[in-house]
Amino acid sequence: VSMLHPRRAFGSALLYLNESNSVARAALAKVRAHLKAKGVRTWSVVGRTGQDALRRAELAIALGGDGTMLRVAREVAPHGIPLLGVNVGHMGVLAGTEAAGIGRRLDAVLAGRFKAEERWMLSTEVHRAGRRIFGPELALNECVIRCGEQARAITLFTRSGERFVADYFGDGLIIATPTGSTAYSLAASGPIVD
């Protein structure tokens, strides 16, 4: 997923929000008005986006916290839509633009003055007895595979494409991207992982 991607001017934007956050709802009105004044067509999204809107969008803006960013990244990444996060939530590591400075940030983005960050994503499928039972699903942070609600040991045979990786015996497996491993490291008072 591209957190921002320098390219042609942005003429349309999908505006995603965490609808349970009243600050996000207020920020949505401000962002929509600012973009409209700049001639950018917008669509507000609550829940999942229709395929037609995803085909037409040139930019996605997530108004919420990091949880909103993770949800929106899964949806827009397959379409190559760049994503800007506006932090109006509790955690704003990924959603790096603060709501108070959104007007200036939007002006910079629309003028092409920004630094793009490309992020790795995981695509996960679970197969049992040769049949896919889950996936493919995208993840920006991590994928967690476990047996179910009750912890018990299982054997996991892991592959990357057709290539064997390893067999694991335990109660589950966490596979993290650099973005996800940084979150785990920071939670343990560790460093940022590149």
Enumerate the predicted regions with their spans.
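ATP/NTP phosphate-donor binding region
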Residues: 1-59, 63, 71, 99-117, ...
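Short glycine-rich anion-binding loops that position phosphate/pyrophosphate groups of nucleotides
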Residues: 20, 66-68, 91, 179-182
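Short glycine/serine/threonine-rich phosphate/pyrophosphate-binding segments
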Residues: 25, 67-73, 181-187
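Short, well-ordered beta-strand core segments
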Residues: 60, 83, 173-174
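Gly/Ser-rich helix-loop-strand patches that form or flank binding pockets
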Residues: 71, 75-89
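Short gly/pro/ser/thr-enriched loop/turn and capping motifs at secondary-structure boundaries
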Residues: 89-93, 192-193
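Catalytic core of DAGKc-family lipid kinases
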Residues: 91-171
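Gly/Ser/Thr-rich active-site loops/lids in small-molecule metabolic enzymes
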Residues: 167-194
